[in-house]
């Protein structure tokens, strides 16, 4: 009886392991639903479908190069400047910085303030530049 329980336990554990790894067959990590890739954003920049792009880095970093059409609103000023942007809370927004830390803070602030379509640039500005997309 004890052996039967052990066999059942091992079979159950193996089944759980196999089921848990079924979604990871190709090894690719799925994109976070609140992200947009550099390629997706590049296709939309300059079109009617372009989101409002917020560069939340410092003005100095922004001046050194930014995604075309991006508006510079440093993450430390974002809360006080939301009104001047003239955007609806349902408008699509894309936020980015250099590494993702400031963009994550901005995304959290925007969502807390009721903005419903906030995404961040997957890989941030480094991914944009690494993809060979233009900077202004």
Outline where the language-model segments fall.
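Rhodanese-like catalytic fold shared by cysteine-dependent sulfurtransferases
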Residues: 2-52, 59-92, 98-136
